[in-house]
Amino acid sequence: KGIITMGSPLEKAACIRYQELLSPNIFNGYGTTESFWNTFLRPYDLPEMAGSAGRSCTDDEVRLVNVYDDRKAEPDDTVPCDNKTEGEIIIKCPNKTTYCYVNNEKATKDKFYKGWMYTGDIGTWNSEQFFTIAGRKDDMIISKGENIYPARIEEILNSHPKVQECIVTGVPDSTRGECVAAYVIKADESPVSYTHLRAH
């Protein structure tokens, strides 16, 4: 018996709880609508690598390439495997992807290049090629020239014991361009302040 989870990263505390209560055999996957799942955390990766999206599936190639404003990175224009430098996740999986959108040439051109699908997801990878999702290119907040990905902040806030769930977005700001706004659902009725959450 085992559990497969998808849709968002499996945070370490949740992983340990699920392993204790339900099953030690947990698989957490990352993928897209166009290409099914493409990376997996396997049971032997957990709980140490919880929070990451795992490594590529057997029949898939997954890379992290540089992001440019005016063009797509070439498939071999990868970022360092240092778990810090962010890039766009690209995927090659011929057995699962059609590499086109029917009757939509523009979307096909935007998404596919030289046999690779450019997901629009931003992440990092380490020397063992474990991927960690940082957010979406489209969701990026630019505040005084700094690129901020909401998913990073959401992960930190969601780890606070007084936070049940949160969502982070950018709001217009006259001096910064955008500021970060977090909408938080408290875990209980006890008070929690902005200062307290910021210190976390």
Indicate residue ranges for each PLM-predicted region.
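Residue-level recognition of short loop/turn positions
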Residues: E61, Y68-D69, S127-E128
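Gly/Ser/Thr-rich phosphate-binding loop
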Residues: K1-M49, E61
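Beta-strand->loop->alpha-helix junctions that form or flank phosphate-binding loops
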Residues: F27-E34, A53-S56, T169-P172
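AMP-binding/adenylate-forming catalytic core of the ANL superfamily
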Residues: C93, Y99-C100, D110, I122-R198
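Active-site glycine-centered loops adjacent to acidic/histidine catalytic or metal-binding residues
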Residues: G7, G31, G54, D121, ...
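Conserved ATP/PPi-binding loop(s) of AMP-dependent carboxylate-activating enzymes
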Residues: R55-D59, D70-D110, I148
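Active-site phosphate/pyrophosphate- and oxyanion-stabilizing loops and adjacent acidic/basic residues
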Residues: I16, G51, K106, E155
